[in-house]
Amino acid sequence: MAEVSRDSEAAERGPEGSSPEAVPGDATIPRVKLLDAIVDTFLQKLVADRSYERFTTCYKHFHQLNPEVTQRIYDKFVAQLQTSIREEISEIKEEGNLEAVLNSLDKIIEEGRERGEPAWRPSGIPEKDLCSVMAPYFLKQQDTLCHQVRKQEAKNQELADAVLAGRRQVEELQQQVRALQQTWQALHREQRELLSVLRAPE
């Protein structure tokens, strides 16, 4: 754990070992670069002082027989190990979309600084915290639903007015049909009366 802590501190100082004070106060290190710096620092620890000595202790007899070959094996082993670790970390970053997530986090933090408002902190009362977070959401949902209800009510009223207008038109047509029917019946009676008069003997 102590080595991890030192690695993080070294990464924050940067690849050249510069301290955070060397960075301007208004500048922040992107978390993607910070992650890369931590990885670089970790990989540098693999070839730190005495790492070769620790390696040779595992193959002491072989090292005594041929130290040059041991050195080449060590160099190749370290290079392949570093490459493998970098590839694994790259795959993890791609699978988890870490670059986009970290950039989004940087953007959120930067926007929070620009607002100048104090960051939200829990009050210690779960009910109060839940209400403070959920109440605005539910109020917004309520406004949206009310707007939809008013819109639907207006649409329903338009449909009701159209139905009433259609009914009035049907009633008017029925009245016209009855009037035409009465007129036709009256005309038919007159024709019958006229025919009966014409057929009557003189």
Curated annotation (Swiss-Prot):
What are the boundaries of the region Disordered? 1-26
Cellular component terms (Gene Ontology): Golgi apparatus; kinetochore; MIS12/MIND type complex; nucleoplasm; nucleus; spindle pole
Q: Where is the composition biased (Basic and acidic residues)?
A: 1-15
This entry's comment on induction and repression of expression is: By polyamine analogs in M1 myeloid leukemia cells.
Q: Which InterPro entries match?
A: PMF1/Nnf1 (IPR007128)
In terms of Pfam families, this protein maps to:
Nnf1
Q: Name one GO molecular function term.
A: transcription coactivator activity
Where does this protein chiefly localize? nucleus
The entry's localization annotation reads: Nucleus; Chromosome, Centromere, Kinetochore
What is this protein's record name? Polyamine-modulated factor 1
Species annotation? Mus musculus
